[in-house]
Amino acid sequence: MNFKRLITTSFTNQIKNMKFKKTISFKPFDINNRIIYDKEPTIVFKDQKSCLLKDTISTTLEDGSKELKIKIGRFTPGLDSNNNYISSDIFEININNYSNKIDLCLNGKNPTFLRRKGKIPTKVKNWEQLLGEQLEIRKSVTLEDGDIISFLGLNGTTSSIQFTIEEDNENEKEKEKEMELDNDNTNTESIPPITSKSTSTSTSLIDTNKIQLKKHFEDPNSKNVGLSALVYFCNKPESFLDVVLYYDDKTVAVLDKYPKAKHHYLVIPRVEINTLDELTPSFIPMLEHMYNVADAIINEIISKDNDDDNLKKSDFKLGFHAIPSMKRLHLHIISNDYNTKYLKNNKHWNSFTTEFYIPFDKILNELKSNGKVKVSIKKKIKKNKKKLIH
């Protein structure tokens, strides 16, 4: 079953104030052979503000604490939707905002078992010894890292998942905050206005000798990257030189993992910011620096790419997605040929050829004029079931 990211505004609003500092995920597990499948994990809760399961509700307890109830069943990404022995609402995970406690409560009548922390006996005589303790309906148990939940089917067949619970790395977040630009000391007057018809002469501030043009990934699936990959690149770009084109103390430029054109790159700020809504006037110098890096990369491509003798600046588009597909806001540099095997469907096409793709100068000018960026297309996306997010 394909893993899909299922976030809606209502879920995000419910959990955006959660102080819970752990990430919960699970993978299918072969309990008979003690093998965890090499698949993308299903994220139950992540980053204190993202819940990837839609049947999520938030309640306030008598002591004033908030509790998040996340329902899980056979239609949850990562579980077998054809397995009738897993009900559509088999159990729920309850997260307490203040105690950081994670409880699991069985809702369905299907026989469900808990094996603590993956500790499976070497020799077992029956499936009861293998699967562990049978859970009781409506009785909560504490969920811990490594726990295996198993569902009993016909003739002793089983289906199992193993949970991973990870602490958020606060040290990395602190390091990112320390790298924020000293905007009070930045002379923005030296940077001329940037429009789609003019380019900034301050690209000379970019050391073009540091730009290393690269071909795109031969096999993107071989790269161990996920929703937080851009954060990893920013934290330690020198460790990803096969992906990184350029980096300095403010930005990192990388190859796009699934390029939607012959030339497709990302410029990422090293300061922590994830959406256009978070932009304030203090980020203007950062955006202008991102533009200068992008412009320098385009100049390098035009001057050094022998396959494109007629390539011009007008052949490139700089812009942001209205809703970023990954953690950390990033600026796209993309050529307008859209000649790539990764442009597979309408969503991919729409994400760069409709108003979902917002030009750089529109974002910068709106921020300068209004002091904030209002992404109006979000309302259209909410009403449209066929979302443009890719």
UniProtKB/Swiss-Prot annotation:
Biased composition (Low complexity): 184-201
Domain named HIT: residues: 232-343
MF annotations from Gene Ontology: DNA 5'-adenosine monophosphate hydrolase activity; double-stranded RNA binding; mismatched DNA binding; single-strand break-containing DNA binding; single-stranded DNA binding
One Gene Ontology biological process: single strand break repair
SUPFAM superfamilies hit by this protein: HIT-like
PROSITE patterns per record: HIT_2
InterPro entries cross-referenced by the UniProt entry: HIT-like, HIT-like_sf
GO CC terms, sorted: nucleus
Pfam families reported in the protein's UniProt record: DcpS_C
CDD domains given in the database record: aprataxin_related
Disordered, as annotated region: 168-201
PANTHER family, A to Z: APRATAXIN (PTHR12486:SF4), APRATAXIN-RELATED (PTHR12486)
Protein name: HIT domain-containing protein DDB_G0272839
Organism: Dictyostelium discoideum (Social amoeba)
